[in-house]
């Protein structure tokens, strides 16, 4: 049912000396997934890797790729504690979405985990930027492995 869907997960803070490699690997892997028939890409909409991946999907859509951007967001006020620049970019990216899903109306201690579960349960592929296993990203990748998703770590 979700064989044409991939999701993104990654850390909010990425080392400056790895960003260029991550970006190049991410661009290549998105193209590889599109070539394999992936048409829908789910982003959790967080600061950091999610924004980078989402921006690439928007750029590829603008270049004529027949793909969809889906946001699976933890709650409606995810950006409440972000700075104005982050909020503006977030709003711009949300405006580019083909679909926006809120897994919870309001923030709760479990809404991020539910968002991550939603992304994994609705995907066949996962592109990650995993540096630390003990993290929300690590938890999402472990769940993706357990569910049998094809996982590509663009940090490697």
Task: Show the residue positions of the predicted features.
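Acidic/glycine-enriched connector segments
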Residues: 1-156
